Structure formats: C-alpha cells, structure tokens
Amino acid sequence: IKKNPSDLPLASGRLITDLNYRHWDEYVETIPHPFLADVTAEGITEGTDILADEPYECPMKPFGGVEQLAWSPDSKSIAYTCRKKSGVEYATSTDSDIYLYELATKQTKNLCKPAGYVAPKNDTSKSKKFQAVNSAENLKNNPGYDINPKFSPDGKRIAWQSMAHDGYESDRNRLCVYDFATGTKQYVTEKFDSNVDDFCWMADSKTITFIGVWHGCVNMYRTDLTGKVEQITNDCADFVSVSLANSGNKLLAIRQSMSAPNDIFVVTPEKKAEKSKVQQLTSENKEILSQLSLGKVTERWVKTTDGKDMLVWVVLPSDFDENKKYPALLFCE
C-alpha cells in the first residue's frame, strides 16, 4: 500500500497480493535496471534503459552486482543476466538467462534459449526435479541458473556460469561457452567434478582460467574449448577471485587461508601446478598477524559409517604439545 489510510496514519503493515515480496532481509520495493549514458565534459547525458518497460530486475536480487553485466570488446553490445519471470513463477524458479543487447538496434537476444522458446508448464504441487522443465530434452535449453557473462578478448565467444536444473539452488556451476559465429553452446568443464566460481579469459581467447574447490581447497584451473581441464595451482588455501594481469602471461588473484586473510597475489601459470609461481603482493594485515600465534592446520581423512572417505580439517592450538590433552570444538556443516 503506497499510502496509508487516513484513519491509520502510523500503520506500518503491508498488503501482500503476490510473490515474490521479499528477498532475505529486504522487501521488494524497487526493480533495478541498467542504463546507458554518455559521459562528456559537460556531464552525463540522460540514460537509456536497456530493459525499458520490462518488469524484471538486473542485476538480480539479492546478491547480483556489476558482475552480471559485460561490455563486448567492440563496445557495440552488452550481455546481461536476468530472470524474466514474475509472481509465483519468479519465486519458484531459478531459471535466469544471459541476454545480448545491441546498442545500435536496441534489440535483445536470449543466448540461452532458441527463439520462440516456451517453457513447460510448472505444477507447483510437485517437485521441480520430476517436471518437464528438467527433462533430458529441455536441459539443452538452459533451464537453470545462468549468470555472470564474460566476452573473450577477440569478441568471438562469451562464457558464463551455468547450472543445469531449474529450482535447484545447490546445483553444480559449469562453464558454458557460446560461439557467436555458429550460435552454439558447449560446456567446457564437464570433466571437473566440482563448482566453477570466478573465471577469466586468457589473452589467446581459447583458454579460460577458473577457480574451483577440490578436497577443501580452492585452486586455479584452466580449460580449453575442447573440455580439457588442468590444475594451475596446488595450494592449501582458497583463491577467491582471478583476473588477467600484465600482457596476459600472469594472473591477478585474491587468496586466503585458515591462517591468513585476503591478500593480493600474482600467479605465473606453468604446465604443472607444482611449478606455477605464486607471489604475494600485499600484506595488509602483517602488523596484526605478527602479534598472533596461529595453530597448525592439517587435513585428515576418516572412514564414514558407510565406508566412504570424509575430509576433516584439524586446527591445533598455537602452543600445541602432543603429550597433552586438549578440549576439542567440533564444527559440522
């Protein structure tokens, strides 16, 4: 209700008539749109809404940011992430797509789905897992969560993170590559049995570096357009971002571990992960860390009740003595 009734001037209640009315800790009161404007010496011109008259958000709430948009290298088009659904359909679906907006024509194309695509009807009384939207036939139409597009340096391809299934928020993020010349898509990290997080194109426009978790550590990997995946780093740490540095021979990254907070590193990739050079550039918390005594962190593998191997991280006290007994704090996730 935009205006309180005259007899209830202090009322703070809300009249909810449809989903989705809330994201985590905030009510849906605005619909963000990206705008294009010229920046001149005289100031900024009036912006052009690239989603004009569309009731859909970009970036997507609640966590989306500028990473959900990308300029093409020739500056003639913009790729953006959007879930063009509303009401109950919006609230129960994770089906977002990557769209290409042409600046000259103001035309938009969905890169995930064929022209004229109509999604199978959704029965909200049943699990999405067993519905037509997640059938083998429809999975080729990217019914899952597609986000964060990035153009190749030569502008011939675009890559993004892609989940296979609609309604499954914990699905595996794969790397999808779209070829503008052929209009075809391919998934180049199918051989990597884990999640693809941040990624960047290399200067050759044929290789993509990405970060992914394996056995409790987040390292760097690379993949080519054939689907081959190779490990770049082998650290007992977590890389949380990656971008191209220098002339394209090095990578700029943020890295953290259970013993150190975020700092900026430069990585020089080699064919074997053990030979890649990882150089720390910043030591933002050096003074604070110098005053702390941190315990050793070790990994252990234990057998579960069903005979499988489970990874356990053990963080020892800073003054650990193996001849003494210590109370233990067990954290399960």
Q: Where in this protein do the model-derived segments appear?
A:
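Predominantly five- to eight-bladed beta-propeller fold
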Residues: 1-53, 81-84, 90-99, 127, ...
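Serine-hydrolase catalytic core recognition
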Residues: 241-333
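Short loop/turn segments that connect beta-strands within beta-propeller blades
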Residues: 39-43, 102-106, 179-183, 224-228, ...
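Surface-exposed loop and turn segments in beta-propeller and other repeat-based domains
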Residues: 48-62, 109-141, 186, 190-197, ...
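Hydrophobic beta-strand positions that form the internal "hydrophobic ladder"
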Residues: 78, 155-158, 208, 232, ...
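Short glycine/acidic-enriched loop and turn motifs that connect beta-strands
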Residues: 85-88, 164-168, 214-217, 257-260
